[in-house]
């Protein structure tokens, strides 16, 4: 194992450091694997350097007249580095890397490795990634962002994702063909990549990461249903992350019912990420539309921060499906107008039960045309 230290670091200390670092550079944001090089054809090659936080000599980087000697062979004073970052902290940018900064980097890296290595097999989860173009923007979900959001509760069952997306679709979401093509692609990919493996018990848990127009997210939820336990992650805007946060107060959900005398189509307004007025629904369905609603008290586009709020939404929606059916009868078509965080749109489909709930007609909010009809479920 390579080391530029002037001290003779005992082999057992070197081995312990490599183990704690999992053979990766401990510089924040690097995480380069320092074992093996496929390009050079050396799978057993070791390319890491052991760096001192407090130099082993007084005149070295972050050196100290007393502590340098005391800490020269201490595991807590050593970091595993790639060549670039070892040179950076000891030669090129010493002033930018004081002892406190390096100690924090070391603690963060080793803490993360300890969490991941400590997760047992029962917490393995297969990752579903689904993205579809929203307006003119492709909704891509990066693998690194996905995998880093899962611990400590879950870890990826493998390094492979179950990708259900269709990137580069030539149709736009204001064209009827877009919804037909995207929905059929999603259904076929789900059948090929997910359902069969669930039935063979190869998949026992799913972690879902999805960004797409809301009707397609609802359709994904319908396909998922309750075939296997799943966690649906939410993409947060500030800070950008897929991890659940604990900041912010709980969301207060408000449920409203239509007047008894209304005789038009039955609608469900879901306003959590934005305010949706009844007038926008009436522009589509007419003034006699019977509008039910489940809305956040203070909707905005980054409102969903807590997993508990997602669970609360599921409970409220489940009760609302039942109440709407009881009021309007078995054969009613329910028109759904969503303005939701992505994960809640998926939950709209997961909560819906095909054998007992009303059929749904899904609408999408189009920037130029308002709410437009997309497709029906089932």
Curated annotation (Swiss-Prot):
Annotated control of activity: DNase activity is activated upon ligand binding.
UniProt keyword terms in alphabetical order: Antiviral defense, Exonuclease, Hydrolase, Nuclease, Nucleotide-binding
GO biological process: defense response to virus
Broad enzyme group: hydrolase
UniProt entry tagged with the keyword Hydrolase: yes
InterPro entries: SAVED
Gene Ontology MF terms: exonuclease activity; nucleotide binding
Chain segments carrying region C-terminal SAVED domain: 186-378
Any Pfam family the entry gives: SAVED
Region (HNH nuclease domain): 1-185
Domain of life of the source: Bacteria
Cysteine pairs bridged by disulfides in the record: none
NCBIfam families tied to this protein: SAVED
Function: Effector DNase of a CBASS antivirus system. CBASS (cyclic oligonucleotide-based antiphage signaling system) provides immunity against bacteriophage. The CD-NTase protein synthesizes cyclic nucleotides in response to infection; these serve as specific second messenger signals. The signals activate a diverse range of effectors, leading to bacterial cell death and thus abortive phage infection. A type II-short CBASS system. In the presence of its endogenous cyclic nucleotide (synthesized by cognate CD-NTase CdnG) is activated to degrade DNA, probably exonucleolytically. Activated by an AMP-containing cyclic nucleotide(s); however synthetic 3'3'-cGAMP, 3'3'-cAMP-UMP, and c-di-AMP as well as the major in vitro product of CdnG (3'3'-cGMP-UMP), do not activate BdCap5.
Protein name: CD-NTase-associated protein 5
Protein's organism: Bradyrhizobium diazoefficiens (strain JCM 10833 / BCRC 13528 / IAM 13628 / NBRC 14792 / USDA 110)
Designated gene of the protein: cap5
């Amino acid at each position: 194992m390579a080391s530029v230290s002037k001290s003779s670091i005992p082999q057992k200390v070197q081995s312990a450091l490599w183990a704690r670092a999992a053979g990766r550079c401990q510089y924040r944001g690097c995480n380069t694997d320092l074992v093996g090089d496929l390009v050079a054809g050396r799978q057993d090659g070791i390319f890491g350097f052991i760096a001192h936080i407090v130099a082993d000599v007084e005149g070295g980087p972050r050196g100290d007249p007393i502590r340098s000697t005391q800490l020269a062979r201490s595991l807590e004073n050593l970091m595993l580095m790639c060549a670039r970052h070892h040179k950076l902290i000891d030669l090129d940018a010493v002033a930018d890397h004081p002892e406190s900064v390096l100690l924090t980097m070391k603690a963060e890296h080793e803490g993360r490795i300890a969490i991941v290595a400590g997760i047992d097999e029962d917490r393995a989860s297969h990752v579903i990634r689904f993205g579809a173009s929203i307006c003119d923007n492709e909704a891509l979900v990066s693998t690194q962002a996905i995998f880093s959001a899962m611990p400590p509760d879950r870890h990826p069952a493998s390094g492979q994702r179950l990708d259900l997306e269709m990137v580069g679709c030539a149709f736009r979401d204001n064209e009827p063909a877009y919804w037909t093509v995207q929905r059929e692609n999603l259904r076929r990919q789900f059948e090929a990549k997910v359902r069969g493996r669930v039935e063979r018990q190869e998949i026992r848990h799913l972690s879902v990461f999805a960004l797409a127009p809301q009707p397609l997210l609802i359709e994904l939820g319908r396909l998922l249903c309750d075939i296997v336990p799943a966690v649906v992650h939410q993409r947060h805007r500030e800070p950008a992350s897929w991890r659940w946060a604990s900041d912010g107060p709980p969301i207060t959900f408000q449920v409203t019912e239509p007047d008894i005398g209304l005789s038009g189509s039955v609608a469900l307004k879901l306003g959590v990420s934005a305010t949706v007025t009844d007038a926008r629904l009436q522009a589509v369905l007419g003034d006699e539309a019977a509008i039910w609603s489940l809305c956040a008290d203070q909707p905005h586009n980054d409102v969903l921060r807590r997993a508990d709020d997602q669970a609360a939404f599921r409970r409220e929606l489940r009760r609302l499906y039942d109440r709407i059916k009881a009021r309007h009868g078995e054969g009613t078509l329910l028109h759904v107008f969503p303005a939701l965080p992505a994960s809640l749109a998926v939950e709209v489909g997961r909560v819906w039960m095909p054998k007992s709930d009303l059929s749904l007609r899904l609408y999408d909010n189009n920037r130029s045309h308002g709410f437009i009809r997309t497709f029906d479920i089932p």
